[in-house]
Amino acid sequence: MPPKGLSLAEKRRRLEAIFHDSKDFFQLKEVEKLGSKKQIVLQTVKDVLQSLVDDNIVKTEKIGTSNYYWSFPSDAKRSRESVLGSLQAQLDDLKQKSKTLDENISFEKSKRDNEGTENDANQYTLELLHAKESELKLLKTQLSNLNHCNPETFELKNENTKKYMEAANLWTDQIHTLIAFCRDMGADTNQIREYCSIPEDLDDLQLPIL
């Protein structure tokens, strides 16, 4: 069975780990070489690196004729906190706009019911009501799209990821134990790995440092 390609998120995590583990500065060619060792396709390293730069997770500076890249764990944490803070502010703003529109719609409906006759003013109120309902629907859609960035939702997903990772690591440990047992019994572990599609570098999963 051929190995599955890495997702963009996993490529970003592995590339970010290169900087955090070394706490050093690198040129692009050095990052490409180190990325290849992390099973990231060479041709994609530059794009993955640029996505980290765009998200302000990796810093870059041109010195002379060369661009240097670096990222420290503390910088990455501050960057994520800044993004979460910005998204939370947007979320709060949309909630306030949604609340205001709800109040306006309730007022317009009440006003329309009390007038009792359909005159020009009432027609204007009806059109305004429809416009505000459409605006409210749009805001609620935007609010729903931002909800996954809510710090509470983010923390819940992070906790679930940890649970799944612990379960996966338990299976990894059991696989290593089984391979060791087979080796002690005289079996060819290389054949076992090949038959069961177990990679040589099978190791425990780890969450990136935030």
UniProtKB/Swiss-Prot annotation:
Coiled coil: 77-148
Signal peptide per UniProt: none
Compartments, record wording: Cytoplasm; Nucleus
Alphabetic keyword roster: Coiled coil, Cytoplasm, Meiosis, Nucleus
GO BP, sorted A to Z: meiotic joint molecule formation; meiotic strand invasion involved in reciprocal meiotic recombination; reciprocal meiotic recombination
GO CC, one annotated term: nucleus
Pfam families: LZ3wCH (PF18517), Mnd1 (PF03962)
Annotated InterPro entries: LZ3wCH, Mnd1, Mnd1_HTH
GO terms, molecular function: double-stranded DNA binding; recombinase activator activity
Oligomeric form and interacting partners: Interacts with meu13.
Biological role stated in the UniProt entry: Required for meiotic recombination.
Family assignment from sequence similarity: Belongs to the MND1 family.
Annotated protein name in UniProt: Meiotic coiled-coil protein 7
Highest classification ranks of the organism: Eukaryota, Fungi, Dikarya, Ascomycota, Taphrinomycotina
